[in-house]
């Protein structure tokens, strides 16, 4: 869930590790929950100009290669969003085949989840979550990275968000090996191609 109150706005990008932040925010005071994983632009429709200038806006991003593995295992083995799969075991039971399917014309990118396009909702560059409709980045005070959450999260929530009781546990964890073990040459390059903006902007490497 993306979360908002009168002091801060958290943009929860799917499978970026933001579940632990959502849990902490929900447990620490007056938070307005707006739907599912909403983009920053959509969240700002709930904010007036006066409140906007005072909001501390933050989000979490994740290495795209790692994020896609997490997404695959979470959606497949929890039977969540079955529409993300083909119904063909040869494709769905093999990560590399699934990656190829997702980025092929066989996958219907126009499906809707809630009120948003399913491809935009789950499979776009994470930067798109914090851009406006013109493709420009919207003000964000802090972009945390999943890879550093273990070391940064407690201090960030206490010092910046002023939370006192911190929950430090994974929310919706997936069980799998290191992401690099799941890729072949082609799938690795597909993710590099489709997530080139994230990879370049956040300096991610395979």
Could you tell me what each predicted segment is?
Residues 1-206:
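Membrane-interface amphipathic segments in extracytoplasmic regions
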């Amino acid at each position: 869930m993306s979360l908002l109150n009168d002091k801060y706005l958290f943009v929860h990008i799917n499978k970026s590790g933001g579940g632990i932040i959502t849990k902490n925010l929900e447990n620490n005071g007056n938070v307005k929950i707006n739907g599912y994983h909403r983009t920053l632009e959509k969240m700002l429709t709930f904010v007036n100009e006066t409140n906007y200038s005072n909001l501390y806006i933050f989000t979490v991003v994740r290495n795209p290669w790692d994020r896609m593995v997490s997404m695959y295992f979470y959606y497949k083995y929890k039977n969540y969003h079955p529409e993300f799969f083909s119904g063909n075991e040869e494709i769905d039971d093999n990560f590399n085949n699934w990656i190829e399917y997702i980025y092929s014309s066989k996958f219907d990118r126009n499906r809707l989840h809630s009120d948003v396009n399913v491809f935009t909702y789950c499979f776009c560059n994470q930067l798109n979550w914090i851009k406006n409709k013109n493709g420009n980045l919207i003000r964000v005070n802090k972009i945390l990275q999943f890879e550093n959450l273990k070391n940064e999260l407690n201090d960030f929530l206490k010092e910046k968000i002023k939370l006192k009781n911190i929950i430090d546990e994974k929310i919706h964890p997936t069980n799998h090996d290191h992401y690099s073990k799941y890729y072949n040459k082609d799938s690795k390059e597909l993710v590099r191609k489709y997530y080139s903006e994230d990879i370049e902007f956040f300096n991610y490497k395979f």
